[in-house]
Regions:
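Conserved acidic segment of CheY-like receiver
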Residues: 11-22, 27-31, 59
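Active-site residues of response regulator receiver
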Residues: 18, 62, 92
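The feature encodes the CheY-like receiver
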Residues: 24, 66, 96, 114-115
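Alpha4 helix (beta4-alpha4-beta5 surface) of REC/receiver domains from two-component response regulators
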Residues: 28, 72, 95-112, 123
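Acidic catalytic/metal-coordinating carboxylates
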Residues: 43-46, 69-72, 107
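Short amphipathic alpha-helix used as the core "switch/output" element in two-component signaling
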Residues: 49, 71-84
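Active-site beta3 strand of CheY-like receiver
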Residues: 54-60, 65
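C-terminal output helix
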Residues: 116-126
Length: 136
């Protein structure tokens, strides 16, 4: 009798939501090197549509977007049953305590200010994904 077991390794998927191409390129490069699949969206509406089509394991979310701002996207994701558990990390140039407080109150798990060290962000995301169960 031959017993074969399979181990399926899932590639973690993150969605980078930012209207600055340089930021999405930086995220794609560093997270790609770390073994992630990186989806991108340049607006709040595009982010919501992308998530409807393909649920990421985590969202990196800028606040200053051309249509729905990051706070609005965060609020929409948290109010929707099938997206409420997706971990969100805000990645923004807004470094005020008020912006950080609002983002965390709306359900983001972390708040990282730009400029940021990509290597540090990868480590933070790795840790969050270890602690948070994968979305169903």
């Amino acid at each position: 009798m031959l017993i074969v077991s399979y181990c399926v390794v899932m590639t973690p998927v993150i969605l980078s939501v930012d209207d600055e191409q340089d930021v999405t390129d930086l995220v794609r490069f560093h997270f790609g090197k770390a073994g992630y699949e990186v989806l991108t969206a340049a607006s709040g509406r595009e982010a919501i549509e992308t998530i409807r089509c393909r649920r990421p394991d985590l969202v990196l979310l800028d606040l200053m977007l051309p249509d729905i701002d990051g706070f609005g996207v965060c609020e929409i994701l948290r109010r929707t049953a099938n997206t409420a558990a997706i971990p969100i990390v805000i990645l923004s140039a807004w470094s005020t305590t008020d912006a950080r407080h609002v983002g965390l109150e709306l359900g983001a798990l972390d708040y990282v200010t730009k400029p940021f060290r990509p290597e540090d962000l990868v480590v933070r995301v790795n840790r969050l994904l270890q602690w948070c169960p994968a979305p169903a």
